[in-house]
Amino acid sequence: DRVLKETGEELVAYLENLKAEDILKIEVIPYAGAEYDANATGGVIKITLKKQREEGLEGAVSMRYYTSIVDQKAWNYQPSLNLNYKYNALSLYSKVGYRRNNWTGGNMESDRFLDRDRIMDANTGMAHRQSHTTFQLGSVYDINDKQSVGAEFNMTENPYHNNTDGTALAIESGNSLTSQSLSRSTTDYSLMSFTANYSLKLDTLGSTFKTVANYTYRNKEDSVYYHTNYSGMMNYDSTSRYMPTARYDMFAIRSDFDIALSKSSKLATGLKYQRNTMDN
């Protein structure tokens, strides 16, 4: 078992890289209890994946491409690769996915105020570029019919760039003011996580003992630059820059001990330790 706390963008990328034939079942739990996480406060999407049954190597390659039919100023492509390998009690799996979004556009606005002899014209151009890269490598080893161990590594890179250029002209009572603005914003987001787990079946009724350890590192760097030049009635420049950073180290280990009292009831106990550090 592995708990993922994803943003909306990360969840979409994870689901897009799943193959339908690898999914055993999907459960949506609106209100999750402590049996899923000790500090659970929201809902849970529980995805159960199939194990590779046959030995050997199997894989899949896919490619998706989208574009705007109207002006072709927006496009998106998504290549992905899945590879799985099984030999005796050892199973290896890997996934690589990439998504690239590009969008350009603009707008023009012209206003006339007859009661105040005022004219305002504005022209804005925008360019948006974003990519999302995911990599996963994992293994499961069945020690025997009752015991198994596993390890998994995940990495995500998600850079985002947005550029906006604008020109505005305001004329009132014969006086004019022209402004030229430039905005550049970038966000570099990265995530790395490592998970190790051990599972033991205690009896035929379904009693189990599980231990899962997880380390996650998140890094987010933002850069926002904005410059405006005014000329005409007033002549001056305005420049601002904003560069926040945030780094998170998260380590968690949990052990679950489920005792089956009968075929229809069980006693679930567990212990969890979590340590979070943040630097921003």
PLM-predicted stretches and their roles:
Residues 30, 58-69:
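Transmembrane beta-strand segments that form the barrel wall of outer-membrane beta-barrel proteins
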Residues 64-70, 101-103, 158-160, 218-220, ...:
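Sequence/structural signature of outer-membrane beta-barrel proteins
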Residues 4-30:
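Short acidic/polar hinge/loop motifs at secondary-structure boundaries
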Residues 72-106, 118-163, 190-194:
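Transmembrane beta-barrel wall of Gram-negative outer-membrane proteins
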Residues 134-158, 185-280:
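Face-selective signature of the C-terminal outer-membrane beta-barrel domain
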Residues 40, 73-75, 105-116, 162-177, ...:
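Outer-membrane beta-barrel translocator domains and adjoining extracellular loop/strand segments
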Residues 66-68, 120-125, 177-184, 236-243:
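Extracellular loop and loop/strand-boundary signature of outer-membrane beta-barrel proteins
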Residues 12-15, 40-63, 79:
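N-terminal periplasmic accessory domains that precede
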